[in-house]
């Protein structure tokens, strides 16, 4: 198993976002703003869904990587650190998913 983590990818996205948009796809996405980055995330998510629905494991792996990357770009633009997302996941996993969902609906 690889030692590469989402935190590693977040650091790379941060570094590359500071480059020239002519030199870095990440910088180009960031310079294009949230609407462009969010649209690209949506496109990649649809491609991942299609790969999952057709049982194409190799393509699903590829598209899942794209989704994670583009999600981190969207989070970068929104100035939401991955740590915040992980804390939310940790909070949610402290109880069953059904209970957590019921609590959200009653709020």
Curated annotation (Swiss-Prot):
It comes from the Bacteria. Its EC number is 3.6.1.31. Its main location: cytoplasm. It catalyses: 1-(5-phospho-beta-D-ribosyl)-ATP + H2O = 1-(5-phospho-beta-D-ribosyl)-5'-AMP + diphosphate + H(+). The keyword Hydrolase applies. CDD domains: NTP-PPase_HisIE_like. This is Phosphoribosyl-ATP pyrophosphatase. The lineage of its organism: Bacteria, Pseudomonadati, Pseudomonadota, Alphaproteobacteria, Hyphomicrobiales.
């Amino acid at each position: 198993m690889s030692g590469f983590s989402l935190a590693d990818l977040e650091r790379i996205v941060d570094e590359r976002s500071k480059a020239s948009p002519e030199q870095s796809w990440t910088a180009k996405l960031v310079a294009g703003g949230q609407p462009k980055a969010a649209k690209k995330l949506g496109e990649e998510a649809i491609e991942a869904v299609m790969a999952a629905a057709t049982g194409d494991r190799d393509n699903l792996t590829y598209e899942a990587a794209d989704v994670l990357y583009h999600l981190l770009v969207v989070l970068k633009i929104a100035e939401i650190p991955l740590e915040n997302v992980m804390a939310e996941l940790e909070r949610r996993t402290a109880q069953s998913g059904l209970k957590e969902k019921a609590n959200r609906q009653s709020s």
